[in-house]
Each structure stands twice: as structure tokens, then as C-alpha cells.
Amino acid sequence: MAELTINADDVRIALNEFAASYEPGNAERVEVGRVTTAGDGIARVEGLPSVMANELLRFEDGTLGLAQNLDVREIGVIVLGDFTGIEEGQEVHRTGQVLSVPVGDAFLGRVVDPLGQPIDDLGEIKAETTRALELQAPGVTQRKSVHEPMQTGLKAIDAMIPIGRGQRQLIIGDRQTGKSAIAIDTIINQKANWASGDVTKQVRCIYVAIGQKASTIAAVRQTLEDNGALEYTTIVASPASDPAGFKYLAPYAGSAIGQHWMYGGKHVLIVFDDLSKQAEAYRAVSLLLRRPPGREAYPGDVFYLHSRLLERCAKLSDELGAGSMTGLPLIETKANDVSAYIPTNVISITDGQIFLQSDLFNANQRPAVDVGVSVSRVGGAAQVKSMKKVSGTLKLELAQYRDMQAFAMFASDLDAASRQQLTRGARLMELLKQGQYSPFPVENQVVSIWAGTNGYLDDVPVEDISRFETEFLEHLKHKSSILTTLAQTNVMDDDTAEALKTSIVAFKKGFFGEGDNLLVGAGHEEYAPIDEAQVDQEKIVKQKR
């Protein structure tokens, strides 16, 4: 047997070579939590000491959850999906990612859930990138003042409560008063801008449906498609059947999709329909997470819930691409009470509100905008010059009309000036009526309001105002270049006003028929004047007691 000899120098050299070439492996630490309780869309998980706020967690059946309450021993988790398969004792793993949604132009024309997954059976969506749901709003130095108009196509709003790109304008009112109709009309009115192909004019729209019936969301999608507006609109849907966690997240998902376009230098319009249901969903989630309740059982941070959402709507500075995101949050009131908790919160956050009155709606004044309570705090700077000129006195005249109308209910005899106010006010109110899904181009609005405020409709019967307006605009479209000039210049100068005056005087003669009595025409018979002696008159005598 050969003798084994060990040379110390060889051993030392071998050890040095091994030590020089040794690379330690990466040590991995896997945190595993366990479900302690689960139910009602909420799970409590113990373990996972390094979890982040708003981090995504994965349950055994693949369902995702959102870490919310980070307590000493356990975590309160909002389950994002079906929670029936989650049971006590199951393992929970970290993903190391915060909640984000895919974004990109491929989302236009699609219906997605709050996680960005398509639910319209039209196949997968190829996303450009992803964006976190909880994003910091642009800072003060990153913003620019609102100065570009966001036309709604509604005369009552564009004339008296103008909205600018980057503004947050609240639409508030009781149920069934036309809140969603105003928002959808505004989306439809962007069709001409989209068809122009000009990026500075185009507006990408996002409609966030929170807690609505699935049939209602399907009807909205069909309406947008029928009016050619779906191609530039994304619908983020969280119907009533969704868990409360999805309804809470849906507005943030819509904002993340919109911010991707805004930071790309594009213009975005986002509708939140409606934030009352989001607040109720957040209240349900917070109570299930055992957070202390406050006023009306809402958690203490319910104001922050809406403020951090709506502050993401902005007009960006030129250095950041000059993009914008305009927000139209909707709030439902009870019995026209705008002093409730959530309505007052959102009123204080937004740049103005459009208040819809149920009494006006029931009186067939639609859109049922209460001009006295509605206001736009920053949109006036974005109003086009021609509209600003013709609508300057409109709000005042309508306010005087409402006061005089209330007074006339108790007065038996009015002077000529008061009767004139009532006559013109009734015609202006009729002029502001507008059918659903029929937005007006701004030049048509300017002509209609100019005719009303300058008294050219005072001798037109109230029931004929709508027909007169339609036929006069059609007359201008084919017989004059006034509408084209207004659309190109957005200026109502003396020459344009004089041309309009000549056109409307000539048109009225044809509308009513020739003659001095303009009320004689179709549907109006001419009678001989009655002698005063033949009229039985009653005299009301008031005696002081």
C-alpha cells in the first residue's frame, strides 16, 4: 500500500485558490403569513412583518389582496376578488409590488374592471406600461392655470358655468335628475375634436361607473357607441355586484389610466359616476377593518379619500407637456340637501359645482341646472370670447326673472318693465332647454343666446322657441357664413352682430308670415280688436281694517 504524503504548501495553495474563486450564493428569505379570519371581502393575516402599505398579497388559491391595516401582530387585507375560497390557516405570500394597472392607447373603446382586466369579451388588451393606483398629485410648480375651454355642448353650462381643461367641476343633485346625462353629453360633445386629428384638440375620455347596475353600464356603453364616442372612451366598471373593495379602487384605476395620457401631453376628461357610492364602499371596508367610525359612520380620512383622488386632475405646465385631466365627479344628494357630509366635502375640494334641482327636472326644464346655486370658480378664464360677450348678462337676467316670478304670484298688477322681465325670462328658460344626447357646437350656442339676451325672441311664443331656434340655425347654416366665422374666430364683433341682426329680422318675417303682427302665422288666427266697452272688467278693492 502506497504511503500517503500531504504537503502543507500544496494544501495552503489549494485553500487560497478556492477562497479567491469562491462566490457566496444569494440568501433568500421568504415571508409566509397565515389567514386567521376571512369573510365579507376582508381577511386578517398574521405574520409578514415586512409588508408595505398597499402591497399586493397572494392567497393560496391565487386571489390577490391589498394590505391595509398594518397592526403589530396582524394585517387587515382587502380581498380583490372572490373570497369564498379563502379559509383560516391558508398561507399568504408577499408579491413585493404595490397595486398598479396597465395603461395605454389600447384601452380606448374598451370596458375594464378596476384592475385593468377587460370584461367586454373583446380579447386581451396590449398595455404600453403599468402605473401605480396611488400616485402623488402634481405639485404647485408643475401646474398651470386653467385657460382652455372644455365644451360640454350644453347651453346652460357653457354660457353660465363654463368648464376649463384641468378643472374639477362637481355635478350634484338628487337621483334621477340628469347627472349622468350631463356627463355623457359632455363625452359625446368631444367627437368633433377627436375627428379633427389635432392632438391639442383631442380629448380622451374615461367613464368610471361605481356601484351601478350592470344593465345601466351596458346601456351607457351602447349610447356612446351609437353616438360615435366609444372610440375615444374607456369605461372602468365596478357594478353593484362587485365587492366593496373594487368599488373603492375603481376611481383610482380610472385616474391612473388618465394620468398616463396627461403626462404624455394629451387632454383627458374623466367622469366619476358617482363618488357617493365610493364613499359608502370605503365606509363598509373601514368598518369591516374595525377602524374607528366618525360622522355618519364614515372613517376619519374620508375627506382625504376624495381630495387625493380629485387633486390628480390638473392642467400641467409647459415643461411637463401641457397635458390636462378634467374631472367631473358626481354626487347624489338626499332631498336636495347639499349640506350633508360627503357633498360638503367634495364641494370644498372641487373648483365649482353644477346643482341639478329635482323641481326643475319635474317641471320639464332639462338640463335641470339651478343657476342660482351653481358656480364655476375658474372656468370663466377658459370661456371663449364670443360666448363671454353674449352671456355676460344672462345669469343676472335669469336671477331677476326668478325673483319677479315669485313676486308676480302674489301681485295682481305689474308695470311694463316687470312684464318685460317675465316675458324675456320665460323665453330664456325655454331657450336653455336641450334634448339628451344632442350637444350644440359653441357657435350655435352663441347665436341662440345672443338672440335671447338681445330681445329678438321676445315676440316669439314660448311654445315656438325651440322650433324657431332650430330653423334659424338651419337658415344660417345654408344661407350665411356667420356660423363658420364664429367657429373660426370665436369673436362676436360689431360686423358679426349686425349681420346676425339683419338675418334674424329677415328670418322672422318668413317664420311668422308677412305683416306687422308677428304672432299671426301657422297656428295663430287673427282677430279684430275688441272695443273696451264690450269687455267685462272686475275691479278688486282692498280695504284696510
Swiss-Prot record:
Record-listed E.C. numbers: 7.1.2.2
Listed Pfam families: ATP-synt_ab, ATP-synt_ab_C, ATP-synt_ab_N
Entry-linked CDD domains: ATP-synt_F1_alpha_C, ATP-synt_F1_alpha_N, F1-ATPase_alpha_CD
Keyword Cytoplasm: no
Gene3D superfamilies cross-referenced by the UniProt entry: 2.40.30.20, ATP synthase alpha/beta chain, C-terminal domain, P-loop containing nucleotide triphosphate hydrolases
Domain of life: Bacteria
Membrane topology (UniProt): Peripheral membrane protein
Catalytically driven reaction(s): ATP + H2O + 4 H(+)(in) = ADP + phosphate + 5 H(+)(out)
Subcellular location: Cell membrane
A single Gene Ontology CC term: plasma membrane
GO terms, molecular function: ADP binding; ATP binding; proton-transporting ATP synthase activity, rotational mechanism
This protein's record includes keyword Nucleus: no
PROSITE patterns in the record: ATPASE_ALPHA_BETA
Sorted UniProt keywords: ATP synthesis, ATP-binding, Cell membrane, CF(1), Hydrogen ion transport, Ion transport, Membrane, Nucleotide-binding, Translocase, Transport
Subunit structure: F-type ATPases have 2 components, CF(1) - the catalytic core - and CF(0) - the membrane proton channel. CF(1) has five subunits: alpha(3), beta(3), gamma(1), delta(1), epsilon(1). CF(0) has three main subunits: a(1), b(2) and c(9-12). The alpha and beta chains form an alternating ring which encloses part of the gamma chain. CF(1) is attached to CF(0) by a central stalk formed by the gamma and epsilon chains, while a peripheral stalk is formed by the delta and b chains.
NCBIfam families xrefs: atpA (TIGR00962), PRK13343.1 (NF009884)
Family: Belongs to the ATPase alpha/beta chains family.
Name recorded for this polypeptide: ATP synthase subunit alpha
Organism of origin: Arthrobacter sp. (strain FB24)
Gene: atpA
